């Protein structure tokens, strides 16, 4: 009986959430068509936006919604859009890429390609700053055997892992390399030495991404949030385009992903979140 508003639904695996969300999407499309709210508004065609995590889920939702619409006598493929969260962010960023110094034809690196590029940034850092520099970042009480392993070559893998985790967190909190470097100026000497190291690697990594040009998955959400916060006209257009947002696997949404969806739904307030709180990896998902 949902017709609008914010709603959280707890759904354990096997409870039929895909079927239910697909049926709801079809109902909302029919509702918009009946009310003629799907007609162009300010040059924007209105759609129900369904966001999920995997491409396979996108295909599944698309097929089910199309089936429900056909049964209602409506044309499939009109009045809704099914995207992964990163696919949605890509749509947002491409629409305003040039205003943020990005090539509108940027490539998107998957996790494997991004990790390979990050490893190159680490190797560049090591070549520029000398491997011995890392010695300063190792705790004095570290076991001698581990220290030898780190400095004999394995340390590049360790640094890449640490840098990847920190960079991902930085982007989740919308912190650029420049912002981190600027904040570190308040802490002279050896304070936050590990963060200084990662900041240098982060800067090199972003420079490499721009040279392609390319964005990684975290960049997509980083820029999507920035654009929506700083461009109210564009945000208004997107809010007109997507008056309803249905979110699948909400328990897996990161802080910045939740922020982007909150910005998109702030005006209309029509946001349905479906997830399993028992599998939540953060605190952004709460049940109704």
Predicted regions span which residues?
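P-loop NTPase Walker
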Residues: 1-104, 108, 236
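Active-site catalytic microenvironments for nucleophilic, acid-base chemistry
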Residues: 27-34, 64-71, 95-96, 120-128, ...
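Short helix/loop segment immediately N-terminal to the Walker
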Residues: 32-43, 132-148, 230, 234-241
């Amino acid at each position: 009986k949902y017709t609008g508003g914010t709603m959280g639904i707890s759904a354990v695996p096997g409870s039929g959430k895909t079927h239910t969300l697909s049926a709801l999407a079809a109902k909302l499309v029919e509702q918009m068509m009946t009310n003629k709210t799907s007609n162009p508004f300010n040059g924007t065609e209105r759609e129900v936006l369904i966001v999920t995590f995997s491409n396979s889920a996108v295909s599944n939702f698309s097929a089910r919604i199309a089936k429900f619409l056909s049964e209602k006598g409506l044309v499939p493929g009109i009045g809704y859009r099914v995207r992964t969260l990163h696919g949605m962010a890509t749509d947002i960023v491409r629409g305003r890429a040039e205003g943020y110094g990005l090539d509108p034809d940027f490539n998107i690196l998957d996790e494997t390609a991004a990790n390979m590029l990050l490893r190159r940034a680490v190797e560049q850092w090591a070549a520029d700053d000398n491997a011995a520099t890392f010695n300063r970042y190792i705790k004095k009480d570290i076991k001698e055997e581990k220290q030898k392993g780190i400095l004999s070559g394995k340390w590049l893998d360790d640094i890449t892992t640490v840098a990847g985790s920190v960079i991902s967190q930085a982007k989740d909190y919308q912190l650029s390399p420049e912002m981190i470097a600027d904040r570190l100026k308040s802490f002279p000497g050896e304070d936050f030495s590990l963060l200084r190291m990662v900041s240098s690697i982060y800067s090199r990594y972003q420079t490499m991404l721009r040279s392609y040009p390319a964005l990684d998955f975290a960049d997509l959400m980083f820029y999507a949030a920035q654009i929506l916060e700083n461009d109210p006209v564009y945000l208004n257009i997107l809010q007109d385009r997507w008056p309803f947002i249905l979110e699948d696997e909400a328990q897996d949404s990161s802080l910045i992903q939740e922020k982007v969806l909150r910005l998109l739904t702030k005006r209309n307030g029509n946001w349905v979140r479906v997830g399993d709180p028992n599998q939540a990896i953060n605190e952004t998902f709460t049940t109704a």
